[in-house]
């Protein structure tokens, strides 16, 4: 694989990781990502909630969790409480309803700080990928000096593109958090 293609793949992976991280930030709207990674102790082992139940959005402020096995309702409720997500599960027979509370201004400010920190971490990761690629280029004795400069320019363009995408995602998420 060429250095350029490898670099782009690593940067795309960093971007995907960032997307997954910020998806879990609570904006006050119900979204399955809020709870799908919660771990639940069932069958003598620990499993992710998304493997034990279907998670759907009833309305903008409510999630509905339908366990595949109705015997797991109490274990799922305990897992959600233990995850410290500030969510209160309400078991109604074989389903669990979770009302998403309105975030406070203090909570929003804290989440925005976390968002900015995660955004900067993602950009640092992308810049580290750029540095590694540039180091590989310089060590490659088959390339001429002009070819190295051209590749470095393309790598910088990739870096700028991915950093810009991170900034745009951060601004969008920050707007979502601020408009609640």
Swiss-Prot record:
Q: InterPro entries given for it?
A: Ribosome_recyc_fac, Ribosome_recyc_fac_dom, RRF_sf
Any one of the GO BP annotations = translational termination
SUPFAM superfamilies on file = Ribosome recycling factor, RRF
User: Gene3D superfamilies, alphabetically?
Assistant: 3.30.1360.40, Ribosome-recycling factor (1.10.132.20)
Q: Which GO terms describe its molecular function?
A: ribosomal large subunit binding
Entry-linked Pfam families: RRF
Q: Answer whether the UniProt record assigns the keyword Lipid metabolism to this protein.
A: no
* Alphabetical keyword list: Cytoplasm, Protein biosynthesis
Location comes to:
Cytoplasm
State the superkingdom.
Answer: Bacteria
A GO cellular component annotated for this chain's UniProt record is: cytoplasm
The membrane spanning regions, by residue number, are none
| HAMAP family listed in its UniProt record | RRF
Q: Which PANTHER family match?
A: MITOCHONDRIAL RIBOSOME RECYCLING FACTOR PSEUDO 1, RIBOSOME RECYCLING FACTOR
Role = Responsible for the release of ribosomes from messenger RNA at the termination of protein biosynthesis. May increase the efficiency of translation by recycling ribosomes from one round of translation to another.
Q: Which family does it belong to?
A: Belongs to the RRF family.
What is the protein name stated in its UniProt record?
A: Ribosome-recycling factor
């Amino acid at each position: 694989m060429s250095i350029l293609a490898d670099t782009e793949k690593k940067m795309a992976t960093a971007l995907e990781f960032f997307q997954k991280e910020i998806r879990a930030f609570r904006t006050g709207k119900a979204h399955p990502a809020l709870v799908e990674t919660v771990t639940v102790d069932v069958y003598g082992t620990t499993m992710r909630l998304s493997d034990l139940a279907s998670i759907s959005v009833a309305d903008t402020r409510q999630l509905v969790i339908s366990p595949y096995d109705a015997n797991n309702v109490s274990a799922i409720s305990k897992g959600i409480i233990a995850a410290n997500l500030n969510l209160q599960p309400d078991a109604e027979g074989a389903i669990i309803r979770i009302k998403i509370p309105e975030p406070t201004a203090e909570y929003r400010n804290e989440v925005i700080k976390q968002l900015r920190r995660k955004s900067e971490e993602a950009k640092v990761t992308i810049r580290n990928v750029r540095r590694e690629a540039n180091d590989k280029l310089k060590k490659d004795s088959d390339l001429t000096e002009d070819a190295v400069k051209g590749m470095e320019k393309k790598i910088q363009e990739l870096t700028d593109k991915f950093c810009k995408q991170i900034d745009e995602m951060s601004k969008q998420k920050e707007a979502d958090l601020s408009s609640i």
